[in-house]
Amino acid sequence: MLITKNQAEKWFDNSLGKQFNPDLFYGFQCYDYANMFFMIATGERLQGLYAYNIPFDNKARIEKYGQIIKNYDSFLPQKLDIVVFPSKYGGGAGHVEIVESANLNTFTSFGQNWNGKGWTNGVAQPGWGPETVTRHVHYYDDPMYFIRLNFPDKVSVGDKAKSVIKQATAKKQAVIKPKKIMLVAGHGYNDPGAVGNGTNERDFIRKYITPNIAKYLRHAGHEVALYGGSSQSQDMYQDTAYGVNVGNNKDYGLYWVKSHGYDIVLEIHLDAAGESASGGHVIISSQFNADTIDKSIQDVIKNNLGQIRGVTPRNDLLNVNVSAEININYRLSELGFITNKNDMDWIKKNYDLYSKLIAGAIHGKPIGGLVAGNVKTSAKNQKNPPVPAGYTLDKNNVPYKKETGYYTVANVKGNNVRDGYSTNSRITGVLPNNATIKYDGAYCINGYRWITYIANSGQRRYIATGEVDKAGNRISSFGKFSTI
């Protein structure tokens, strides 16, 4: 750590009303503010595309200097904790702020771009908007993560000298450099690709997807070309195959793209199978490891339409193999199934948002920024939640078990009592440490095991009694259970 807690608090207190843009793109975004704080404190920068992924994209880096805490019912944040909001904020990008104070019901924090006014003037680099760092009061959400840095009591002269170098390096690394990017619509010429739901792969991608991705990337300052020119009249697969057949590894298809110095290549397709097959994924050469762009595009697919599988290495596709042969930064993305009605209904309705998010994945930051208070466009329905042994789905599709017993709080801060089985539900009171209640049912949802009971008021109430994993297995407990 390069500053003490007192120094960090002074910087934080003085940040109110100011603006921060360390990467010099799209004005004053929420991620910029958290990144500036992290750079000043540690000399390193947070990396990644979306705010909600900060704890996961930067896990090893953060844990060198502090800890990542997933919010739980009786957790109390501290001043200077970095709070990471889930993906339903910021149009799917999430949001991040820094805590000023907290109680068990709400917390107060400082942040940029909560109202989407951190970038308004239309200039990508560096961009400008009137919204400054402002104070907000928030309820807790689920999932919500807090990053707590371990500040020292004092910093040595040597560490101070290192801080100047590390902060300068971090700021330099934060700047996003323009790239030369080639976007390739799959199929072409006399090959329409897959057909389904009133359209074909070749025409749909050329009309709705590649031009919009190009629009947003150009807005971000990148040099972008569409394969085959503005009409996208060529098929890169057929062109590459011709180059292979005639032994010309310079003038056709992906060889031509390489010879013209493109830094990044994205080829876009729609998948096809039975009507029930759903979701997208990214394909790369088995000779490469997935890079940040591959993972970020995969995240866009997963968090919006849904994924059928993760980033997939292959060695049986022509352009994939040629990309390894000539060492070019290439991936093929299947954005969803043209043969699945739900997939195509979602893509047709949200093609501009989808394109913008994919462009942001390539750019390395959400393009144009997003209003934190807006909930993202709804994804299509997902599969039923996992049902642990002994539970059944109730009428609301929530795993429930008829169970009676006693629960005794074993947490000095007590357990929040709510009017529903979600950390978004209203807190109606706090069950103090060592208090015991008789319960008559249990739920497993939203990352917690909940119990329910009738309070003295005659109203049904709910308590989160511990965390569970994705399969519903208990991994922590806030109290003790006993049978009746």
Curated annotation (Swiss-Prot):
Q: Give the EC number.
A: 3.5.1.28
Q: What class of enzyme is it?
A: hydrolase
Record domain SH3b: where:
402-472
Which BP terms in the Gene Ontology apply to this protein?
Answer: cell wall organization; defense response to bacterium; FtsZ-dependent cytokinesis; killing of cells of another organism; peptidoglycan catabolic process
Q: Which InterPro entries match?
A: CHAP_dom (IPR007921), MurNAc-LAA_cat (IPR002508), N-acetylmuramoyl_amidase_3 (IPR050695), Papain-like_cys_pep_sf (IPR038765), SH3-like_bac-type (IPR003646)
* One Pfam family in the UniProt entry: SH3_5
Name this protein carries in UniProt: Probable autolysin PH
- Species whose genome carries this gene: Staphylococcus aureus (strain NCTC 8325 / PS 47)
